[in-house]
């Protein structure tokens, strides 16, 4: 039996995966039993290459995907487990990854995840400790043997390497330029951080789907990787189309033109069943014709629907997909395209940018997002935090020689807190990402604290949770005006260090304790951070035995041990 990794590496066939949505309740519940029965039928279907199992889809509490996945895996079918960041912090995600590896689940779809919906006694608190980029980075490092401190010692040991085959989701089904381009840049970042396959988001525009394929094939950073792209096909019904129309599912859009067609066919005697199945089959044919690695079929809950869609697709002539590609183009009004339209095919022309977009690159103009606040902040930051400048050296000296190197001089701490709270609504996280996001705070202005590019949930440029413009769209506008928008994610993955919360981000940046700690001075002028919030009192809230808990060192560790940790690549200096 071939693994999903081997099948995608073969590149000679067109694969098919089916999404299995988990349920709320135990395996004793009727709905779980129906889902289990459907899974059994998928296992027996030779045309299905893998089964993909969701992780609390839509932010709803549901049965663990591993509970549904075990019988499928043990029956011999490949399983793709969704793993999202909304419900676990990094420790929980690492623990879940170890469990998956131990149970034989090696295929993982790394997701930031949907914002939590209503749960037990109300809405659950979102976690989003790390994002999909951070998760991919962690899984990639686990594949190489994750470094970890020995119990009670300063030296590092290496865990046994895992064998994860990690993928990610990407979307360009967005209306505005400052949504689409950051999504494409994040797609590159996901591949750079370990995504070995990409699944597109639900969408109904063949030209947009072709654009993503062209982008992956032509971008110098990722073209050589030849990462497989899998097209997303969702079986609509009249009710689902109306549900999507309300934009209840973040990132999924039904345009006016498509909705009108759905409503028209919903009035037929079969309530549009034939039309919706044909639409799904046509999308599969388009993906096959364009050269996608496979199709990802969602919205199906019966094997009869799967078989019907596949039968319809087999009935098409070899080149019918070309006409379907012209037909299935349902953008929203004034939607942005990255590439120019090829008039012969109706699809993307990878040799030409969309004319209006290309013109905007030649003559860059400021938008409302290029504010005076931004310009002043950038000027001051460059003067103080650029290594080697006079103010940078002075700042390092001041904070290094202050009584409390985590807070710095009291006057500067007051100035930092007052200015950043006023200008950026700073939450005092101590590991500041303002310079990474064009001086916009992800803690106060992003519902998911996304520090490595936007999530996929924006609606017409606005946050899926709060009704304001996405910070990554605003950051793109600022960086585009300066000609640096293509570099907005050209940095190591940002993984926030929670132990720095409540400390001075100025001190942490200047002394190389924050996520930017890869700077050359880190080894010579950094004190390794310990948990500054740990208590020295005994009892439940007190300091814990480092041997019993697995902590790298006691809170009152000798400074020489701290410096050994720095040189060993310990917690205060992230690996490249």
Ranges and model annotations:
Residues 1-49:
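Conserved N-terminal beta1-alpha1 strand-loop-helix module at the mouth
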Residues 2-4, 136, 141-144, 301, ...:
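Extended, intrinsically disordered, low-complexity segments
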Residues 16-34, 79-91, 165-182, 262-278:
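Active-site mouth loops of central-metabolism enzymes
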Residues 60-70, 90-92, 115-135, 147, ...:
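Active-site-adjacent beta->alpha loops and helix N-cap segments on the catalytic face
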Residues 90-99, 182-185, 239-240, 305:
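Catalytic cores of alpha/beta
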């Amino acid at each position: 039996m071939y693994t999903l990794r081997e099948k995608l590496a073969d590149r000679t066939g067109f694969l098919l995966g089916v999404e299995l949505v988990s349920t709320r309740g135990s395996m004793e519940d009727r709905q779980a039993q129906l889902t289990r029965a459907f899974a059994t039928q998928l296992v027996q279907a030779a045309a299905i290459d893998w089964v993909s199992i969701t992780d609390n889809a839509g932010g709803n509490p549901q049965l663990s995907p591993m509970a549904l996945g075990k019988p499928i895996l043990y029956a011999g079918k490949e399983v793709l487990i969704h793993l999202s960041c909304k419900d676990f912090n990094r420790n929980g995600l690492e623990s879940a990854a170890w469990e998956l590896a131990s149970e034989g689940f090696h295929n993982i779809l790394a997701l930031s995840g949907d914002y939590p919906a209503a749960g037990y006694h109300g809405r659950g608190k979102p976690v989003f400790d790390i994002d999909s980029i951070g998760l991919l980075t962690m899984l990639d490092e686990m594949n190489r043997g994750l470094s970890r401190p020995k119990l009670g010692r300063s030296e590092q040991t290496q865990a046994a390497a895992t064998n994860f085959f990690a993928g990610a989701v990407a979307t360009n089904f967005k209306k505005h330029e400052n949504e689409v381009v950051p999504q494409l840049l994040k797609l590159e970042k996901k591949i750079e951080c370990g995504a070995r396959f990409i699944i597109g988001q639900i969408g109904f525009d063949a030209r947009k789907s072709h654009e993503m394929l062209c982008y992956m094939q032509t971008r110098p950073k990722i073209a050589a990787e030849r990462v497989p792209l899998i097209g997303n096909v969702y079986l609509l019904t009249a009710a689902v189309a109306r549900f999507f129309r309300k934009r209840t599912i973040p990132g999924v859009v039904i345009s006016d033109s498509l909705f009108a067609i759905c409503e028209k066919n919903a009035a037929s005697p079969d309530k549009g069943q034939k039309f919706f199945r044909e639409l799904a089959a046509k999308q599969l044919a388009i993906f096959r014709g364009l050269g996608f690695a496979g199709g990802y079929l969602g919205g199906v809950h019966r094997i009869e629907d799967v078989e019907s869609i596949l039968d319809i697709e087999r009935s098409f002539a070899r080149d019918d997909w070309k006409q379907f590609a012209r037909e299935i183009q349902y953008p929203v009004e004034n939607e942005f395209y990255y590439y120019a339209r090829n008039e012969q095919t109706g699809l993307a022309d990878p040799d030409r940018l969309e004319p209006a977009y290309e013109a905007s690159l030649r003559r860059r103009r400021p938008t409302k997002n290029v504010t005076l606040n931004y310009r002043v902040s950038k000027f001051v930051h460059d003067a103080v935090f650029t290594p080697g400048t006079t103010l940078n050296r002075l700042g390092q000296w001041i904070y290094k020689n202050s009584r409390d190197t985590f807070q710095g001089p009291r006057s500067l701490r007051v100035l930092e807190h007052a200015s950043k709270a006023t200008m950026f609504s700073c939450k005092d996280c101590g590991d500041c990402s303002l310079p990474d996001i064009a001086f916009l705070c992800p803690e106060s202005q992003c519902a998911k604290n996304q520090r490595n590019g936007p999530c996929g949930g924006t609606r017409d440029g606005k946050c899926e949770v709060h009704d304001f413009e996405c910070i990554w769209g605003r950051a793109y506008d600022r960086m585009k005006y300066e000609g640096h928008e293509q570099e907005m994610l050209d940095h190591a993955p940002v993984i926030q260090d929670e132990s720095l919360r409540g400390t001075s981000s100025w001190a942490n940046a200047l002394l190389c304790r924050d996520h930017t700690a890869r700077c050359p001075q880190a080894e010579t002028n950094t004190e390794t951070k310990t948990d500054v919030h740990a208590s020295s009192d005994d009892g439940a809230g007190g300091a814990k035995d480092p041997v019993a808990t697995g902590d790298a060192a006691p809170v009152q560790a000798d400074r020489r041990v701290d410096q050994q940790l720095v040189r060993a690549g310990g917690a205060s200096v992230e690996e490249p």
